[in-house]
């Protein structure tokens, strides 16, 4: 009989512990200073050296986050194919720009700097005006900066002391870009 009471008591204690764990709040809140929150929400490859939250969201939506860490060029090719096929829209186009720049910064491959500029330009000036970026979209300013920085790095002189504006055929990860440039057109 004592053994039965012991089992009952042990079962009761187990049930109370289980009930207490089930009633615990699974989510908590921690106070964070506003400037820390702002830096986290507005951080990008240009400001903190990591892709922005919108770009990370695209990687997760496409199940490419892990692949980008392991095989960035393959992940970029997959995302490029999704955009070209029409399965993904402007969010992925922006992500391609930022991720191409991020990869270029790590590898110093000019083709990826130029790709960042091409994707940023396509995001800023879409063929379909109904997909023009909202002037209040924080990605708009970042895309303009990615365009400028991508062009500057892609066309930098060998010693990177200046930008060498010139005509030519430039390699891209997904093809090539033909550029015609006439110095007489400069002001």
Regions found by a protein language model. Give the residues of each.
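Bacterial N-terminal signal peptides that target proteins for export
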Residues: 1-12
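Processing junctions and N-termini across compartments
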Residues: 14-17
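C-terminal motif of bacterial Sec signal peptides marking the signal peptidase cleavage site
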Residues: 19-22
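Extended, non-transmembrane interaction/recognition domains
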Residues: 183-187
């Amino acid at each position: 009989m004592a053994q039965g009471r012991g089992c009952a008591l042990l079962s009761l204690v187990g049930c109370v512990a289980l009930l207490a764990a089930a009633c615990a709040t699974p989510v908590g809140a921690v106070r964070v200073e506003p400037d820390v929150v702002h830096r986290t929400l507005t951080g990008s490859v240009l400001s903190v050296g990591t892709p922005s939250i919108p770009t990370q969201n695209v990687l997760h939506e496409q199940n490419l986050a892990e692949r980008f860490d392991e095989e960035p060029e393959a992940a970029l090719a997959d995302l490029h194919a999704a955009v070209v096929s029409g399965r993904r829209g402007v969010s992925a186009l922006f992500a391609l720009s930022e991720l191409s720049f991020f990869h270029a910064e790590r590898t110093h491959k000019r083709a990826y700097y130029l790709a960042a500029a091409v994707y940023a330009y396509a995001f800023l000036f879409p063929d379909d005006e109904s997909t023009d970026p909202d002037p209040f979209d924080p990605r708009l300013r970042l895309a303009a900066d990615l365009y400028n920085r991508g062009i500057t790095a892609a066309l930098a002189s060998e010693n990177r002391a200046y930008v060498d504006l010139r005509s030519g055929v430039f390699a891209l990860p997904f093809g090539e870009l033909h550029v015609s440039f006439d110095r007489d057109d400069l002001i």
